[in-house]
Amino acid sequence: MTDRDHTTVTDARGPVNTGPGDQYVIYAATNRLIRRRAESLRISRDDRLHLADRFVPPARYRIAADLLEEPGSVVLVNGRPGSGRRAAAIMLLHRFGEDRNIDEEGVRVEELPVTGKDRDAGSDEDEVPPGRGDRFLLDLSGITDEAEYGEARRRLARHRAQVQEAGAHMVVVLPWAVRHDHPPELAQHTVTLGRPRGLAVLTRYLRMDGMPFRAADLASTDLQRLCEQSAVRELVRLAGLVRDARDSGRFGDGFSAWLGQALHAVTNRADEVQRQVAAVRDTPERALFLAAALFEEMHADIVYAAWQRLMGTVRHEEEATSELGRTDFGARLKVLGIGRDADGRLRFERLAYADAVRTYFWANFPGVRDDLRDWIDTSSELRGLTTDERVDVVVRFCERSLAAGRPDHLFDLAARWADRAPGAQCDPRAVAALELGLGHERLGGWFRRRMYEYVRSSALSDGLARVLTVVCRRSLAATHPDQAVVRLRYLAVRETEASQEAKEALLELASRDRRLYRLLIDRLRPGAGRDTNRGNPHLDLLTALLGSDRAPDPPRWPDLFLGWEAVFAQPPTELWHPLAGSWLSAVADDGTPEMALEVMVGATHGRAAALHRLYVIAYGWAGPTPSASRAAVANRFWQHIDHARYARTPVTEQSGAGPRTMEEAR
């Protein structure tokens, strides 16, 4: 198994409570991720179902679907940027299983790494070979460099051979920029997809949002031109803006008004913001412009406080006159086109204007990005902000920082907030920042590598460890479960106050999936024989994992044998009692096969100390007056123990006389 870079797309996306303690549900961040699906790698089953309801097949889609039919098939899809290539590839994999009513339990639906640079530095993990029926996506569409494409082609050849041998299925999205260099030997497996009809895409999304419209409402020349020329993701954004205009209640009460506002937002906003910033020359007005864009829909007093902090962060000193002698706050807002509702909340008068303002400042004032990071650090803590509002501000900042290629700003802030969290609390701002980073299509690998480096560091604080635990459990486990296991394992064996939360999350995650269960056994076995000043956390964790309540159903005996073998190779401890007792109870009460008794005893390799302790455990488990079922199970267990002890004794082999059984010795 491997700590490799791939995306699992089988698990549902949502909050999961994996044990005792608080559950951190970041609704604002989650909702915003749902609104920005095109930028996220989180294509869980729920997300695929969402896309399937809205998907419009492009030209030649059926040809690609037919090529994917046979076990071991690899289909390469080509197409111009903006034609919806990635969405089509995801739907090919999704509908392959849907059309056949395939149960995805135990089937891998994963995104593979593009190049080796996205793997953990120094990772010694081996890639997991695919199984029959597994489905894989390899998206090479972002490659523009021929050297990088050369490496990607070598990885493609290796993946293709594995897929064919296993009878799995793979869809590859080819890069358009280097289309002249596509492998000729795969031409017969390559399909060049057309662009879906833009108007059909827009119509499908509008209908799924419950929009009341007629065909005549979509007949304008501007809209028709947009549908013919724009990338599919821009049409999806347009439909989302129509929904936002409707839901806001501020832009008319009919579809035509909502569509007009949305069209204006996607075609003219950038130029409007540029002209307005050029007209506003002084620092206070520009700072207020940006503060209102980050804190839009929040109370005016909060925006005012954030504005003042921003001017302090950029080291601007106001004029010496008192505030009563300056332009009042309301007048400044009016000049900037910012309205104040009856409840005191501030909003830009035009649809999607705040987003355009944020985009403009991050793109055109790169010298203040570090200052903006420090400003958000403290401004997101302003008194009066609700938790959802704090997270919303952080999400807006993170979106712009990621677009500007500054993932380090997100991680720096997450670490600061995590370290300042009181007691054992987990700051939701830190969780939201890291979740957004992990879900970013281009920079998600950077965050996974950074997390890997941090969990291995002895300098990791308890606060950040708690945040990383939550992020692994909530987010990374849904997209890269094997990487989540590796990181949680490092967190769980740290022997700190925060490690218990990681342990519970890790055991819960591993017990849900056979692959992950075996992966964790393999990762814990080497450390089972290494004691520390405070015991052996690897051995403790492995023993907890091997209980009957954690094992997959039905149990996979070779995996359990490897785990029990590592445990029973160490001196007996009290942890053996719940481990062995859980399996004895499972055999007696739950119909677990007796194979459990034989495999458990076999894992001792006849070690006398281990066999003796297991005998004593069974004696205590049965009790002085055992029930018939317990007495029968205990007797069969003792028989396996006696057989193991008898079989390994050299004297027995030479003389033919057996040693005393455990029962006789007792």
Task: Tell me the role of every PLM-derived stretch.
Residues 1-43:
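Long, low-complexity intrinsically disordered regions enriched in small/polar
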Residues 37-65:
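N-terminal pre-Walker A segment at the start of P-loop NTPase domains
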Residues 72-88:
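Walker A/P-loop nucleotide-binding motif
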Residues 85-104, 267:
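P-loop NTPase Walker A phosphate-binding motif
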Residues 103-176:
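Conserved P-loop NTPase "ATPase switch" module shared by AAA+ and STAND
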Residues 179-183, 203-266:
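Amphipathic alpha-helical "lid/sensor" segments that cap RecA-like P-loop NTPase cores
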Residues 271-274, 280, 295-427, 444, ...:
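C-terminal leucine-rich, beta-strand-based interaction scaffolds used for sensing/assembly
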Residues 386-572:
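Extended amphipathic alpha-helical coiled-coil/heptad-repeat regions
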